[in-house]
Amino acid sequence: MDSRLALATEEPIKKDSLKRYKILCAVLLALLVIVSLGLGLGLGLRKPEEHIGSCRKKCFDSSHRGLEGCRCDSGCTDRGDCCWDFEDTCVKSTQIWTCNSFRCGETRLEAALCSCADDCLQRKDCCTDYKAVCQGEVPWVTEACASSQEPQCPEGFDQPPVILFSMDGFRAEYLQTWSTLLPNINKLKTCGLHSKYMRAMYPTKTFPNHYTIVTGLYPESHGIIDNNMYDVYLNKNFSLSSVEKSNPAWWSGQPIWLTAMYQGLKAASYYWPGSDVAVNGSFPNIYRNYSNSVPYESRIATLLQWLDLPKAERPSFYTIYVEEPDSAGHKSGPVSAGVIKALQLVDDAFGMLMEGLKQRNLHNCVNIIVLADHGMDQTSCDRVEYMTDYFPEINFYMYQGPAPRIRTRNIPQDFFTFNSEEIVRDLSCRKSDQHFKPYLTPDLPKRLHYAKNVRIDKVHLMVDRQWLAYRNKGSSNCEGGTHGYNNEFKSMEAIFLAHGPSFKEKTVIEPFENIEVYNLLCDLLHIQPAPNNGSHGSLNHLLKAPFYQPSHAEELSKSAGCGFTTPLPKDSLNCSCLALQTSGQEEQVNQRLNLSGGEVSATEKTNLPFGRPRVIQKNKDHCLLYHREYVSGFGKAMKMPMWSSYTVPKPGDTSSLPPTVPDCLRADVRVDPSESQKCSFYLADQNIDHGFLYPPAIKGNNESQYDALITSNLVPMYKEFKKMWDYFHKVLLIKYAIERNGVNVVSGPIFDYNYDGHFDAPDEITNYVAGTDVPVPTHYFVVLTSCKNKTHTPDSCPGWLDVLPFVVPHRPTNVESCPENKAEDLWVEERFKAHIARVRDVELLTGLDFYQEKTQPVSEILQLKTYLPTFETII
């Protein structure tokens, strides 16, 4: 086609397009002008309305000055002539706890929850964010972390106030998972210090743990052993909904507010279990009767008002409590939108507190602790054990849930005669997939300290995580979440955070138990604590300048002599050794018991690397017995070792240990026959045999075995228990020595017949080997100590130690483990782990004190002693 023809035909098309384009542009331009004029007119019209018809600074003013065509008085709604901003400026401003652009400089509103008026700072009723919103100050949550060795307190505050803030059911994992949604709490975590978690006491319930936190006492000691309980001496029932909750007869111990008041300080509590009870006849100086209907903001605002009191009236110590995220966790479970919303709610409340403190220039003056009482775990109606599946008829009363107890229905008449043993027997080892273990309360793990109180019923069920135990189907709600479980479960771990001039900054600390908080609070207040179950000084590492410096316990019974005088015994004690046929052979092995001074020093260095245990019991006649492979502290009155200490190095090979030399026992020539056990003692008792505290074959050679095949190494053991004890030493001890590059072992008997967690007086021991005066232990302890830095061995450890202590019940059967038709490797280690303990628990049960010659500050030794190893990994 000719190019000119092509151009000719395209020209009309281009002209039409251009015409349409011009029309479209004109239309758009016109629309733009119209919109601009509309906006201009609208804004122009609005300006006089804002100036003439706005309620700003005129709320509830009946004079109508400066208003045309609308009103801002309280009757305008009924008349229908309110100004356009009346609702936002006048009504909503009385319903919120914050300032905004409408409120800044407002006329004072009498009904307002807080003020944003220009004189609010002077009148001390500002909303907590007044300075940030109305004066442009940087909010606390976004400002940089403060750092100062000295308190930054305003005039009138000679000592930093202490605030204890509890967020019920805030499990430690929440803070790890949702910290980005919690800016205020996360700021505290970043700038202050926090623990990986804080361990709650058992049962992990609200009232027992809150009262433990403020008394430093175990629930068995302070009396609030559960949220629901019966006291046979009072013949009354306690529950959170009953009037008995306010009866001081239930509440023992000295809560921190009373400790402070007794020493001249004032204390205030905006809720805390026990704070609205006349404990010991007294309330805190300022307190509120509990009501869950009071908004969190109101609680915070009131606490801030208490801080504004004149110096002579102002408290030094404050508690505040909020119900979330516990309530949401119960309703929806721990992994739920409801819990996230509740976490944000408590974060906002905490942020309000910190903004209020900053507004008073107290944010770097106050020592504040934020913690929880326990965690939360998921439950389901698919995970419930019903007692009707175990009994044809339920003729007992049961406290249901995650920490069940069983007692008689007929109270008080049958309380003490109820056959608890039969209930435990009928519930033991019934199913292969049974999700609880029944215990008589005295047999519960000693680390729980949950036995010595008449309110703790004698039958107890330890329930698997996320399971419940009920009487029968349909007896209670089972969906959602709950707590109360074994306090070693990770889901029961609680938060602990702290911030203030006394605390270290930007620090993460190892987990600890909440019984230690009371002593910490006393140190912050510079007062002396009442007697409690905590270990004072164990939390010194949280503080920049600790108020209290602990010291080692004083030894109350010195060791006497058990010297070597003759190589042949005065009395054979009915003992014999087939391997030693002549007196010359016996004399030769006995000479090994006569160590030189150099040999004593060598065995002390190897087998007592941290010093011998000190005896804190009074009038405990004992002597030290030295051997090349172990050292013993021999108790003369009980005719057995109180403790034995030895070190097991990491073995060069993993071959099994040789058998113990058979049919070989002899009298220890260093111990008087009247203070020794006879080998014939065990012939009459069909259920008890002799065991060895120090395992003779642990070193692998016969010569050293003879040093242990002596009467001073004998302890009475139930035959079933001995199977477990022997397996531990032959297999597990070697395993731990391999894993830890050697372990120092201290083991011994425990006597706790009154199950109070402390060593018994002689007249409290009630069971003896048949026909003898040899007492039968209630438990045996084993404390394994290694170097935390595993490149070092226990006897050459320059730094921190690691511990693995056990307190295992000494019982005639192993029914706790249901071992029938099971190999020992399937249940023995699990049994030992179930009875893990703290070194401090061992000390209380034995009257011994460990690690006195370890070159480390005593406060650091206390950290070691109060450490509880855990094996739980599932949240």
UniProtKB/Swiss-Prot annotation:
Record text on cofactor binding: Binds 2 zinc ions per subunit.
Localisation per UniProt entry: Cell membrane; Apical cell membrane; Secreted
E.C. number(s) listed in UniProt: 3.1.4.1, 3.6.1.-, 3.6.1.9
Pfam families in the record: Phosphodiest (PF01663), Somatomedin_B (PF01033)
GO cellular component assignments: apical plasma membrane; cell surface; external side of plasma membrane; extracellular region; perinuclear region of cytoplasm; plasma membrane
List of residues binding Zn(2+) 2: D326, H330, H483
Active-site residues per Swiss-Prot or TrEMBL entry: T206 (nucleophile)
Positions of short motif Cell attachment site: 79-81
Matches recorded under SMART domains: Endonuclease_NS, NUC, SO
Cofactor list: Zn(2+)
Transmembrane domains' residue ranges: 12-30
Residues bearing carbohydrate: N237, N280, N289, N533, N574, N594, N702, N789
PROSITE patterns referenced in this protein's UniProt entry, alphabetically: SMB_1, SMB_2
Region feature Phosphodiesterase, mapped onto this chain: 161-545
Known tissue expression: Detected in intestinal epithelium and liver (at protein level).
Cytoplasmic side: 1-11
Residue numbers spanned by region Nuclease: 582-875
Membrane topology: Single-pass type II membrane protein
GO biological process: ATP metabolic process; basophil activation involved in immune response; negative regulation of inflammatory response; negative regulation of mast cell activation involved in immune response; negative regulation of mast cell proliferation; nucleoside triphosphate catabolic process; phosphate ion homeostasis; phosphate-containing compound metabolic process
Binding positions for Zn(2+) 1 per the UniProt entry: D168, T206, D373, H374
InterPro entries on file: Alkaline_phosphatase_core_sf, DNA/RNA_non-sp_Endonuclease_sf, Endo_G_ENPP1-like_dom, ENPP1-3/EXOG-like_nuc-like, His-Me_finger_sf, Phosphodiest/P_Trfase, Somatomedin_B-like_dom_sf, Somatomedin_B_dom
Molecular function, one GO term: ATP binding
Quaternary structure and partners: Monomer and homodimer.
Similarity annotation: Belongs to the nucleotide pyrophosphatase/phosphodiesterase family.
Protein name: Ectonucleotide pyrophosphatase/phosphodiesterase family member 3
Source organism of the structure: Rattus norvegicus (Rat)
Gene: Enpp3
